[in-house]
Amino acid sequence: MINLKNQKLNQIKLIQILFCTFPISFIAGNLLLSIHLVIFVISSIFYIKKENITFKLEIAHWLLIIFFIYTFLITTIQFQAPGFLQGKNINWVGSWPFESKPIFKSFILIRYLILALVVHVLFTQKILDLKKLFLVSLICSSFVSLDVIFQYYNGVDIFNFKGAVDRNSGPFGDENIAGSFLQKFSFLSIFGFLALYNKKHKNIFLIFIIVLHAYALLISGNRMPLILFFLGIFLLFII
């Protein structure tokens, strides 16, 4: 009985660790992120099935499923047989560009639908802790911000990746996605800070975090993430 309880706790701990460390996988690259995602989903489904956890699909879930099916079908028709929409006779096998395999790329998107449903179930069971995710996001986004700033002033980041003339990607190397990463995870960082830090001088540290991320976004060379960041900050403070 004790072994079963310990095994259950270990499974929960594994799921929690995998969930909270997603920001780290984003930095590590697409391959590790994909592996991380698959392990998390499989571990979560195995736990849900083992514990006989049931859940009811709500309207929002059905809308999400319909959206993914619609996107999958439209993408498949558009890339595999574009003439089908104009009523042309299509040689389905011969016209499919298997070298690019967009149907498989489209099908892979379904994993995010499964991820959303799994996270919903685990969150309703109070297995996932968002505060820990916020904290890891704060650490990761702050690290990327500091690395981008270091690269801007020194020509290379701490991993010896060189920056371009007008772009600084920090730990992402040749992929110019530092701005996109900071824009997405900066809000999780700010939410994490607001949720975890309730001490004196809170506003000073909050301003420091915002300025740090904003400056890193500015020198990363990604203009749209910078605009979205300021728009998000504006909406955050007026809501």
Residues covered by each model-derived region:
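Transmembrane signal-anchor hairpin modules in multi-pass inner-membrane enzymes, especially those
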Residues: M1-W92, S100, V121-K131, L135, ...
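Residue-level detector of secondary-structure boundary/capping sites
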Residues: I15, L33, P97, L109-I110, ...
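Alpha-helical transmembrane segments of multi-pass inner-membrane proteins
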Residues: F22-P23, R111-V118, K131-G163, G170-I239
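Residue-level signal for alpha-helical context at structural boundaries
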Residues: I42, K56, Q151-Y152, A164
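Interfacial juxtamembrane loops and adjacent helix segments
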Residues: L85-V93, I158-D166
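Short aromatic-rich membrane-water interface segments that cap or initiate transmembrane helices
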Residues: W92-F107, V165-A178
